Each structure stands twice: as structure tokens, then as C-alpha cells.
Amino acid sequence: MAIQHPDIQPAVNHSVQVAIAGAGPVGLMMANYLGQMGIDVLVVEKLDKLIDYPRAIGIDDEALRTMQSVGLVENVLPHTTPWHAMRFLTPKGRCFADIQPMTDEFGWPRRNAFIQPQVDAVMLEGLSRFPNVRCLFARELEAFSQQNDEVTLHLKTAEGQREIVKAQWLVACDGGASFVRRTLNVPFEGKTAPNQWIVVDIANDPLSTPHIYLCGDPVRPYVSAALPHAVRRFEFMVMPGETEEQLREPQNMRKLLSKVLPNPDNVELIRQRVYTHNARLAQRFRIDRVLLAGDAAHIMPVWQGQGYNSGMRDAFNLAWKLALVIQGKARDALLDTYQQERRDHAKAMIDLSVTAGNVLAPPKRWQGTLRDGVSWLLNYLPPVKRYFLEMRFKPMPQYYGGALVREGEAKHSPVGKMFIQPKVTLENGDVTLLDNAIGANFAVIGWGCNPLWGMSDEQIQQWRALGTRFIQVVPEVQIHTAQDNHDGVLRVGDTQGRLRSWFAQHNASLVVMRPDRFVAATAIPQTLGKTLNKLASVMTLTRPDADVSVEKVA
């Protein structure tokens, strides 16, 4: 699908609050989130249109929640296949690991297949909602420089015209070969896998079985994935001595496909492309007024489908912080928490992806034999088998420092973890997901209590200036009890009983939830005021009447 760039006037000598380099998924998500926050954004993209061939094929529950946060999830869902299981097969076809988590704690299925070009198109179309956001295609970023209070970008159009853009901040979403990262000499440390893989996408799926299968064939490992809209993806390891040109030849392509199809000649090829699996992590995510996100900050093998999703986590973590800084509601030190929170988890996902690749294609043949034997034993260890089945090995993001307040060293503290998203009942009787009731805001959520009770008037003013929603959760049968209403507080019913269970488990009655849906702090009514003061301090929030016009980057 070819998505042409919109007819927009060039931004010659134009000033914006945020310039985003790259109109890939991370750049588009950043632009959508900042756009809805009223930030003046310019996206510049080297290509003349969105990439129109499939790349990533897995989108998880956290990424769908991010789509929900910018009002696009309903447009994205038609291009997904929910509850998409991943099955690892031995060379003889026995399934030794069946990963099909059925949890929806964040409001959406944990594993989903998707068609990336169509989802990217949804995000690009989403930008048309915001007059403060523009996207310029066919613009090459030739150079940039930082000053105390701005970044100057030098662009070149396809016709050779030069343009200058001045921005308060530059977010580099320009991919694994990031020009911005290389120009700043930020080390991009890691490894490149010795073997390449050839990806073959086929229309009118000739196999049409559901889910994704990864076969640990020692002769040539391969992957078979069912995608939405009747697309089938096959991936085959490129063996030593083979080249992409050789594998593209009809007789060799026929030989590859004969491993997985009875009639390799009767297929409709979309494309064939060879990939190298890299595992690399930028040493720094922030360099003064430049921030790295997505593949510009980290790249990982595809085996857990987390490259795309990690980029979405970057965008969700960074966008609300950047908006607060630009709006003068927080000092720019808040942006330092972006690397503090995201870098360690990105590394954990890289390590998991590398491990999954080694399980599929062990470096040594004896390791594959050992894998098959151990996997057989798992059938006799149900708790261990469930651990894999429910995908509990996936490192869930948890932040131990940053824009949050942790009391003590409680091992099972919910602070720094994503808050659940169950369905809730509104006072008018509508049932909706929790985030829909909150919007793109902070929230102070209390079980049964008035969340304003423990706050001073000054605190209420400060947190309302951030757009904070104050939520009182009650058992659904109490939702229409008028005597419990409080001005400025939204009451919701605990439709599924999940919120009561969550608060009971964590021995807290109040949660401060950030716009990216992570728990910033927990409290009880008597400690909420003190906790909010600590949180305002670590987030470097300004007072509603504070003058931050002299803010400088350290």
C-alpha cells in the first residue's frame, strides 16, 4: 500500500517546539501524542512516503494501550489478529514451547499479529486531527546543531532546495542507522548475529493455519507466521556461503518454499528481503536537547516481536514528559528520567530476544538436541510449562528510579509497574475501559475513598493544573449512591472486581498513575499529601504560577 505524503508547504526557516526525525512508527506515535497535548510538532522524513511493505509483525498489549492513549486503537484493531500464539517446534514437528498468554490485564490481548504498513498509515492519518502537527516527506536531514535553547536542523528536499528548521527539542526516530546518533558520536554497543535470514511475504495465504511457528530445524531453521488480511510470512536462515541474490533465484526460492508448502510454484509473492539480526543499545538516550527513541536507541532480533513494542514504550514514556517541560509545568531534568527508566528494560528485551533466537537456532547442534530433551521434560513439570505458556518470562517494565516515589524496598511494590486497565461502569451506566475515563492525564485513583481528602488546596491546584483526574472506585452496586459524590471527583464502578483485588493485593487505597499508565506512587488518604509532595519534587514540577521562561539545559 503506497501512502503518499500530504501536500504541505515546506517549513523553510520555520520554528517549532519539537522536531521529529523519522516518520516510522515511533516518530508517528510521538507526533500523535504531542499533537493532542497542543505541542507544535514537525516530522521530517527522508523517504517520499511511508514504507509500504511489512516489517514488524507483532504488537503487544502495552503498544495497543499506547494506541488507545492517542485515540487510534479502534482504527488499528482491524489490522490485527488477537491472541496470536507462538509455538516452537522440534525438527520432527513436536511443539516444545507453546506461548499463548490469555491475560488482558492492560485491557488488550497480550500477543497480536499485525500488518505494520496499515497501522503506520493509521498513525499518519491521525496527525490530520491536529493543526499544530505537520509531516514533511522527501526531506533529508543533512546537519543539525544545538544551542542553549534550541536545535537548528538543515534539510534538503528531493529537488535540492535547502530548508532550515529551528526547534526547542529534537527527537531522533531515524532508525538503527540513525544519522542523529552517529553525528553525536553516541556509542551503539552490541553484536551482530553471524547468520542472516531471508523473509518471504506471500499474499492470499497458501497455508492459512493460525498462529506463528518457529521450527528449530538444524539443517535450516525457519518461521511460519499467519498475518492479518491473508498474508503469510516465512523466514529462513541464510546458511554460510549463500547470498541474497542466489536465494532470490526462482529455483532456489522454490526449494526454500518446498520445506513449508506442497506447491511452491503457486504463490503470490509480496516481497523477499534479507535481514541481519542486530542486538545493540545506545550508551545515552539524551544528549542535551536531542533525545533518541526506537531503533535509534536500541535494536534487537525479531524473535520475541519486541523491537516495535519497545519503540512504542519509548514514545509513551517520553512524550508526556516532553509535553510537561515545553508547557512549563516541569523542569527539563524530568527528561533525564527517560533514559533512567527505559534503557535497562530495553536491554532486558534485547537479551530475551537473543536468547529466543538461540533456542530456535542453537549455535551448536548438540545444544539443539539438549533443547529438545529438556522441552520434553517440561511436560512433566506443569508449573514450569505454565510459566512459558503464559509468557511470564517476558520482562515486564518496572522502574526502580525516575519519575516515581518508592517507599522502602518492598519486593512486590507496584510502584514503577504499569497499572491494570479493567472495565469500569460510569455513573450514566456506560461500561468502558479505565483509560477512556481518564484520558491522556495523570490520575489519582482511590478505592472507596475521596481522593481529594488528603490533599491541601495548594496541592489540588497544582495537580489539577497538570490535568489530573481524581477517581473514586466503588463496588458497582454503589455507583448510583448520590450521598458519596464529591465535587471534582469522577466515580466509577468496579465492573469486574479487578480493582478491588489489585488494591487488596498491594495494601494501598490510593494510586498516583502517570499519563503513560505507570504507577508513580501509592498511599493511603493520610499519607497522600506527603507522597504527592515527594513526587512533585522528583518530577521537578513547577508551581502553577511559576515562571520557567529562563529554563536552560544543563
From Swiss-Prot:
It holds the Pfam family FAD_binding_3. It comes from the Bacteria. One of its GO terms (molecular function) is 3-(3-hydroxyphenyl)propionate hydroxylase activity. Its cofactor is FAD. It catalyses: 3-(3-hydroxyphenyl)propanoate + NADH + O2 + H(+) = 3-(2,3-dihydroxyphenyl)propanoate + NAD(+) + H2O; (2E)-3-(3-hydroxyphenyl)prop-2-enoate + NADH + O2 + H(+) = (2E)-3-(2,3-dihydroxyphenyl)prop-2-enoate + NAD(+) + H2O. InterPro entries: 3-HPP/3HCI_hydroxylase, FAD-bd, FAD/NAD-bd_sf, PheA/TfdB_FAD_monoxygenase. Keywords: Aromatic hydrocarbons catabolism, FAD, Flavoprotein, NAD, Oxidoreductase. FAD binds at residues 17-46, 285-295. Its EC number is 1.14.13.127. One of its GO terms (biological process) is 3-(3-hydroxy)phenylpropionate catabolic process. Pathway: Aromatic compound metabolism; 3-phenylpropanoate degradation. Belongs to the PheA/TfdB FAD monooxygenase family. Catalyzes the insertion of one atom of molecular oxygen into position 2 of the phenyl ring of 3-(3-hydroxyphenyl)propionate (3-HPP) and hydroxycinnamic acid (3HCI). PANTHER family: 3-(3-HYDROXY-PHENYL)PROPIONATE/3-HYDROXYCINNAMIC ACID HYDROXYLASE (PTHR43476), FAD-BINDING MONOOXYGENASE (PTHR43476:SF3). This is 3-(3-hydroxy-phenyl)propionate/3-hydroxycinnamic acid hydroxylase.
